[in-house]
């Protein structure tokens, strides 16, 4: 009986340690994984080069493509911009969800070509597919 109790105690300790060391997803990553196209009211894309600014609304098909790309992001795609380092973006997208607006804009920082704000934090996003998509719909030419 004592050996069975010791075995149970050992198993509980191992499981507890495993749970403590488990990597928790960043809040923003959970948000991007849970996002659905039907949650989004509109997606506006904009760019500003020189003195000309353009603003257009994405089609349902392009919105679905954007959501698919956002759903694929991983924790490694995000780096917290805790010092609020950045510049003035020249292009980006704005998602309207339940009356709130979420921007994904150009970034000039090495940790990511895009940046966003979520959960009172600024985040750099490093994902080539998403960056290419945003540049494409914003009609950015390098």
Ranges and model annotations:
Residues 1-18:
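Sec-dependent bacterial lipoprotein signal peptides
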Residues 20-142:
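Function-determining sites in protein domains
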């Amino acid at each position: 009986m004592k050996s069975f109790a010791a075995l149970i105690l050992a198993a509980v300790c191992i499981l507890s340690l495993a749970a403590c060391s488990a990597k928790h997803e960043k809040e923003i990553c959970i948000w991007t994984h849970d996002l659905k196209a039907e949650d989004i009211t509109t997606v506006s894309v904009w760019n500003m080069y020189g003195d000309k600014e353009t603003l257009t609304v994405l089609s349902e098909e392009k919105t679905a493509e954007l959501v698919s790309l956002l759903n694929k992001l991983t924790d490694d795609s995000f780096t917290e911009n805790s010092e609020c380092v950045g510049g003035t973006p020249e292009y980006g997208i704005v998602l309207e969800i339940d009356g709130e607006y979420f921007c994904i804009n150009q970034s000039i920082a090495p940790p990511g070509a895009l940046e966003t704000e979520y959960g009172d934090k600024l985040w750099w996003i490093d994902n080539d597919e998403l960056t290419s998509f945003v540049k494409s719909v914003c009609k950015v030419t390098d």
